[in-house]
Swiss-Prot record:
Belongs to the complex I subunit 4L family. Keywords: Electron transport, Membrane, Mitochondrion, NAD, Respiratory chain, Translocase, Transmembrane, Transmembrane helix, Transport, Ubiquinone. It comes from Podospora anserina (strain S / ATCC MYA-4624 / DSM 980 / FGSC 10383). It catalyses: a ubiquinone + NADH + 5 H(+)(in) = a ubiquinol + NAD(+) + 4 H(+)(out). It is found in: Mitochondrion membrane. Signal peptide: none annotated. This is NADH-ubiquinone oxidoreductase chain 4L. Core subunit of the mitochondrial membrane respiratory chain NADH dehydrogenase (Complex I) that is believed to belong to the minimal assembly required for catalysis. Complex I functions in the transfer of electrons from NADH to the respiratory chain. The immediate electron acceptor for the enzyme is believed to be ubiquinone. The gene is ND4L. One of its GO terms (cellular component) is NADH dehydrogenase complex. GO terms for biological process: ATP synthesis coupled electron transport.
Length: 89
């Protein structure tokens, strides 16, 4: 439980501190999702339930698809603007 909380807080901290870099924001979101998946997996192992393990595998597959789509959008954004930095006004 403590490891998942630490991972989730690292993800939140990375997201908050790197507001101008889209790649680091995506990595931070993936770290938070990994923490939640790890919590579901550990909880299902403690309760000896296979449904939680199935959910964890499903979440990992969806996260992989999400990352691929996000990076594809990021490449298109870079080709359009020439930069991936976020500008706040």
């Amino acid at each position: 439980m403590n490891i998942t909380l630490i991972l989730f807080l690292i993800g939140i901290l990375g997201f908050v501190l790197n507001r101008k870099n889209i790649i680091l924001m995506l990595i931070s979101i993936e770290i938070m999702l990994l923490a939640i998946t790890f919590l579901i997996l550990v909880s299902s192992l403690n309760m000896d339930d296979i449904i939680g393990q199935t959910y964890a595998i499903y979440i990992i597959v969806v996260a992989g698809a999400e990352s691929a789509i996000g990076l594809g959008i990021l490449v298109a954004f870079y080709r359009l603007r020439g930069s991936i930095a976020i500008e706040y006004k």
